Amino acid sequence: MEFSEWYSDILEKAGIYDLRYPIKGCGVYLPYGFKIRRYSFEILRKLLDETGHDETLFPMLIPENLLAKEGEHIKGFEDEVFWVTHGGKTPLEVKLALRPTSETTMYYMMKQWIKVHTDLPLKLYQVVNTFRYETKHTRPLIRLREIMSFKEAHTAHATKKECDAQIEEALTLYKAFFDEIGVPYVISKRPEWDKFPGADYTMAFDTIYPDGKTMQIGTVHNLGQNFAKTFELEFETPDGEKDFVYQTCYGISDRAIASLISVHGDEKGLVIPVDVAPIQIVLIPLLFKGKEEIVMDKIKELNNTLKSEFRVHLDDRDIRPGRKYNDWELKGVPLRIELGPRDIENGHALIVRRDTGEKITVEYSNILEEVEKIVSMYKENLKLKAEEKVKSFITVLDFENDVNSLSEKVKAKLLENKGIILIPFNESIYNEEFEELIDASVLGLTTYEGKEYISVARTY
Amino acid sequence: MEFSEWYSDILEKAGIYDLRYPIKGCGVYLPYGFKIRRYSFEILRKLLDETGHDETLFPMLIPENLLAKEGEHIKGFEDEVFWVTHGGKTPLEVKLALRPTSETTMYYMMKQWIKVHTDLPLKLYQVVNTFRYETKHTRPLIRLREIMSFKEAHTAHATKKECDAQIEEALTLYKAFFDEIGVPYVISKRPEWDKFPGADYTMAFDTIYPDGKTMQIGTVHNLGQNFAKTFELEFETPDGEKDFVYQTCYGISDRAIASLISVHGDEKGLVIPVDVAPIQIVLIPLLFKGKEEIVMDKIKELNNTLKSEFRVHLDDRDIRPGRKYNDWELKGVPLRIELGPRDIENGHALIVRRDTGEKITVEYSNILEEVEKIVSMYKENLKLKAEEKVKSFITVLDFENDVNSLSEKVKAKLLENKGIILIPFNESIYNEEFEELIDASVLGLTTYEGKEYISVARTY
């Protein structure tokens, strides 16, 4: 099955996201999908809270004159902004944009809060919906008109040094986040022509989808003093001088969810990383005539034992076990535990791993410990598999002075192996003309195994 | 100080909400305010999750034809809907409403999901931003153009009986929620002319603000089959017949936060209920020359002891203790613990309650237990005080056949005691004409101490 078909199919069948809403690029997070989102963003929140970021909530509407304040920024967004022009039947005096992102909103407010160096650093974030009038093909959780979950962090600092250090902190946080949700990544410094509108430079996380195309899943922008000058974010330094703050911003969206689904899934359905799984363990009783009560009693006991540490679901529906297996494999539940009369007689239980399909018979008396062990193997394996997949998608080419010959080789490799092609850095090909020649995107400058490359790929 | 002045003042000074945004009725949840919101809505989420409600996320934009599908419903909202008319520079073919509430969105989708009685009950909720083009005076967290937090639950049932039972469940949940965040309430069945547009009837929670005006803080609507017929929510019953589902919906907004602030605050600032306090205990070291290290070591130890159960903050700023006391009293931190050299010598610590101002010397060796005891007294006291306040605002009048004389008495009482006036039910005054006569609102039918009354009040 083609990846994109598999993807649409699994979103519907596993109850992740329903796109049958009468506006293109707008859909519904279904209960199961919402739980994955909730657990994922809780991990992100925890990482941010622990490093001194404060959660806030800013307005969704932006007056036109405020959005237009930063020239480059508005140029980057003006074709894709939704505009509110009426309240009831009354035309508004100033039209209002649905936030495409919140720099202008947040920096307008920061102006009220930042007066002196002791007000800094300021490290804020919010998790909100944002909007883009996409005219291109939309794709659920990947290219939406309503991005339902956008975690955007915005920081302000007294010195360039602290600002640069914040970029490092953001990269570290995002690495930790993607590691925890099991999504592998390649980090690149985006080329000038593809950086965030208004930024000094942009660092980006890309992952690779099963079809070999890359997906941008996180960005970290060093804004320098650009926005600060526009928004007059001036403060008094310890020496009593005036200076503009240095700023960073960084964001992660629903694409994190799309990616953890896409990277791990297989032909049977989802394979969910343990930490974000709505159900971590499903219990299936194997009922035989006359033994129903013994089995149900035992499996309820097991449910209680495991509940203290895991999100467990006891599937006691009156359908045959085989159908239950299929249902929960489709939904990507990490572990399934089967318990029948013979298991109980022998003091055993059967654990089945979703990632490898492996069946493991364990001592019932020791089950919590056994489950913990298998859960940590599952985590380790998912991480390894994801990293291997990404590695298998990376090809290193030699640089050649003959641009035409080089670009032919790149194109051939992109057709053959897909994924990311790395070429040792050379200024002569680091430009948009090269993108046109290879009919693919320059992701930017990527450090890989200690060396610096230009990375190129077909992107989503 | 006037209540409304106190309220605006405290939002700013305590860092709850900043309204200096260039759109009327739109503002920013600041870090401290956001935490109160987060803890409050977590309580609500937990209550909903435990009773089988599933969290979801639906689109924010509603096509005009979908919003207009239910005639009464759209009539109730059409004057206050914000309309998106353009994407970039392109006029949209169908204009899009910013959701004022999500009945139409959700029921359009329910049509895709409900086919047969086994698909029921369906109990969904979401916590989202909603929008009203308010032309009246706006007020932070009370009357907003962007309602930043709206928890809306929507359920569908196979029978009227189950639907009615769901109304009871919703009332029970909301009671538990307001009890936990310490906001007292009076429940009324709203009169016909004030029910939710499209509902069979509306039950509402009102609390009373310090100025004697009531604030609607939660509503529970029995929609019967009204929306189901419009949205064709038909299903196959166990007998193979066709029927329309029975529906309820119920919502709680930022007003819950506004109310817990307003009901408990005093002239020194906020008094926050323990369960939603961003900081539950603040530790203040009393430093004397030469004893700094002893005190700091001990108070760090105390911090570690208490952290296991409470949200604790150690205030080690280099300012005098008096200023710290003021800061944390303003922010409404439930308990303050002071520790100085003499306390350490005597094996004591001093605990100060924010609600009563009481100072309690406790044995340091037993401090966790002592704190737990005081915390539970604090909770109990806040609940009692809030209930007493509401009771003191309730006046019962006798019914009189002479409507003019009765309305004069109501008006006098409203001037004198403010709050809610209860009048034994009589059909002759249960109408909008009576509202005009008394220049106040009929809240509806209220059961109070076992009897049924018509309740009237000045409302926000």
UniProtKB/Swiss-Prot annotation, chains A, B:
Q: Which UniProt keywords apply?
A: Aminoacyl-tRNA synthetase, ATP-binding, Cytoplasm, Ligase, Nucleotide-binding, Protein biosynthesis
Please state where this protein is localized.
Cytoplasm
Notes concerning its domains: Consists of three domains: the N-terminal catalytic domain, the anticodon-binding domain and the C-terminal extension.
Protein name as catalogued: Proline--tRNA ligase
What family, per the record? Belongs to the class-II aminoacyl-tRNA synthetase family. ProS type 3 subfamily.
Q: Name one GO biological process term.
A: prolyl-tRNA aminoacylation
- Species: Methanococcus maripaludis (strain DSM 14266 / JCM 13030 / NBRC 101832 / S2 / LL)
Q: Which reaction does it catalyse?
A: tRNA(Pro) + L-proline + ATP = L-prolyl-tRNA(Pro) + AMP + diphosphate
Q: What does this protein do?
A: Catalyzes the attachment of proline to tRNA(Pro) in a two-step reaction: proline is first activated by ATP to form Pro-AMP and then transferred to the acceptor end of tRNA(Pro).
The answer, when asked if Cytoplasm is one of the entry's keywords, is yes
Q: How does it assemble?
A: Homodimer.
Molecular function per GO: ATP binding; proline-tRNA ligase activity
SUPFAM superfamilies from the UniProt entry: C-terminal domain of ProRS (SSF64586), Class II aaRS ABD-related (SSF52954), Class II aaRS and biotin synthetases (SSF55681)
